[in-house]
Design a protein with these regions (language model features):
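Active-site segment of extracytoplasmic enzymes that catalyze sulfate/phosphate-ester chemistry
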Residues: 56-57, 63-146, 167, 173-174, ...
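Short, solvent-exposed turn/loop segments enriched in Gly/Ser/Thr/Pro and often Arg
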Residues: 63, 69-70, 82-105, 112-113, ...
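C-terminal cap/loop subdomain of S1 sulfatases and analogous C-terminal strand-loop tails that border
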Residues: 164-167, 171-175, 322-328, 367-370, ...
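Loop/turn elements at helix/coil->beta-strand transitions in domains of secreted/extracellular proteins
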Residues: 50-55, 79-84, 95, 108, ...
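A short aromatic-rich beta-strand->coil structural motif
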Residues: 54-55, 60, 138, 150, ...
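Active-site-proximal cap/lid insertion segments
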Residues: 46-49, 65, 91, 172-198, ...
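C-terminal region of N-terminal signal peptides and the immediate post-cleavage residues
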Residues: 26-47
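Long, internal low-complexity/basic segments
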Residues: 32-34, 49-52, 59, 272-282, ...
Length: 498
């Protein structure tokens, strides 16, 4: 069984990249890199008109410690490739989802939070990000496109459908999985309390129907199914109620421990009480139960693809918008930090030319998905996109001069009263920060001047903050360059630690 690949083993491969000359790296980084022009898999060679399909399942708050409880996803992992060092641009729903759609960092697409002037659906619109979405690019290139489930924070079913989607089945605050409205191609439909109304199951049925109609149309398709699970309040499908009540929470060495020399916001946190720890166990069990219906959906969609003869020409991509801590660093249940628990999430892919059972350890980011979809669809990637296509990595290539740093940007805490990501951790959540992650280090710089620096090669659980002893200048320079980069060439050069 494989779930979360070992960070230590991944680090050995990633560190080997550091010795590559920066000049070679920059030459490869242009839009003509191997990743940008993958060789066509052999079984497609006889079908020059055939373009690949995409099924993209995006979960909400799913952390690596849930993957081992999802048998269909584990089977997909064995049949496909796992990106073991895939990071989100921010451990928060809307900034992460915006980056996935646009391929841009928050400082470039303008979405830093879930609401307010610098976040949410309205900021996404105000910054013209709907026009940057990979969905619009694929739609204009002849793809059938469908968006199902959760779109962006603040979006409600009464709002108009954004451009670029042929089918639109999107809810608003449907975190409870029952009693919600769906905007179904511009018409609102209410779903109630019946077991058949369970949202993840409704999405699974609609997604299967979309695959069926796409097969009949003969057109390539992009299907995104964005579940609300396993976000709180953790409502499992009735068939899975109490299915995980014997599980214990998988504690790591960081559980209920403060790092040495913690930043001020974290140093104020009390250690976990007995009640806190009991709640963490209960929450973990509910999250597992919540995800079992997501896993069922994965199996159903794979079966539908096989039944229609589309499985060999469809990339099936699974991921999460952010990770989730539960007791680590004395924090109860939540996200938003730059710790590994929150920013590193699953990215698992199967499909044409994707090697089975492979683990890719290069640093990858949520800004890379949009250019990957566009590249695999045969489209040019706009120069304004900050990310880089993963097509070469997905096809088993090992590109020379891959990036050596990625950026994480977080604004907060600044909650709207109805923000579903409002956390209960006391006395507070992390303030605004920017961070850089490399194969062997994490450097965090807070707006108030505090810093964190962890040598993750020797301290993988990030328990010894070395910032007081000095931060390597190469990390400071990388963060300075990444936080101001704009566009593919600029952001790729900034990521070379040179």
């Amino acid at each position: 069984m494989r779930a979360d690949p070992s960070a230590h083993q991944a680090g050995k491969v990633a560190r080997a990249v550091v010795g590559v000359l920066v000049a070679v790296a920059f030459a490869v980084a242009g839009c003509t890199s191997p990743a940008a022009n993958p060789a066509k898999p052999a079984h497609q060679a006889a079908h020059d008109r055939s373009r690949p399909n995409f099924v993209f399942v995006l979960t909400d708050d799913l952390a690596w410690n849930l993957v081992s409880h999802m048998p269909h996803l584990l089977a997909m992992q064995r049949a496909g490739t796992t990106m073991s060092r895939y990071y989100v641009v921010d451990s928060l729903c809307c900034p992460s989802r915006s980056a996935i759609f646009t391929g841009q960092y928050p400082h470039d697409d303008g979405v830093f939070t879930n609401a307010g002037n610098d976040g949410g659906y309205f900021a996404f619109n105000r910054h013209g990000d709907q026009q940057k979405s990979f969905a619009l690019a694929l739609h204009e290139a002849g793809y059938r496109t469908a968006m199902m489930g959760k779109y962006l924070n603040q979006y409600q079913p009464a709002y108009p459908e954004p451009p670029g989607w042929d089918e639109w089945d999107v809810a608003g605050n449907a975190y409870g999985e029952f009693n919600y409205n769906l905007n179904q191609d511009g018409r609102q439909q209410h779903y109630g309390k019946d077991p058949r109304d369970y949202l993840t199951d409704v999405l699974a049925a609609k997604a299967s129907a979309f695959i069926d109609s796409s097969a009949a149309s003969g057109r390539p398709f992009m299907l995104e199914v964005a579940t609300f699970a396993p976000h709180a309040p953790y409502t499992p499908a009735p068939r899975y109620a109490n299915a995980a009540q014997q599980l214990a929470y998988p504690k790591t060495p960081a559980y209920d421990r403060l790092p040495a020399n913690p930043p001020p916001w974290l140093a104020r946190h009390p250690y976990l009480s007995a009640v806190d720890q009991a709640n963490i166990t209960t929450t973990f069990r509910k999250r597992v139960e919540d995800d079992l219906s997501v896993d069922d959906m994965i199996g159903e969609l794979e079966n539908e693809l096989r039944a229609k003869g589309l499985d060999r020409n469809t990339y099936f991509v699974f991921s999460s918008d952010n990770g989730f801590h539960m007791g680590e660093y004395t924090l109860s249940s939540g996200k938003q930090t730059a710790f590994e628990t929150d920013i590193r999430v699953p990215l698992i892919v199967s499909g044409p030319g994707v090697p089975a059972g492979r683990v890719v350890s290069q640093l990858t980011s949520s800004i890379d998905l949009a250019p990957t979809f566009e590249t695999l669809a045969g489209l040019p990637v706009p120069a304004s996109v900050d990310g880089h296509s993963l097509a070469g990595l997905w096809h088993g290539q090992d590109p020379v001069g891959w990036r050596l740093a990625i950026l994480i940007e977080h604004h907060g805490p600044d909650y709207s009263p109805d923000d579903p990501d409002r956390q209960t951790s006391k006395p507070g959540d992390p303030p605004t920060y920017e961070a850089v992650r490399t194969p062997t280090a994490l450097y965090v710089r807070y707006a108030g001047g505090a810093q964190e620096y962890y040598d993750t090669a020797t301290d993988p659980y990030e328990l010894d903050n070395l910032a007081g002893k000095g931060v390597p200048e190469v990390l400071r320079q990388a963060l300075n360059a990444l936080e101001t980069c704009r566009g593919g060439a600029s952001c790729w050069a900034a990521a070379q630690l040179g």
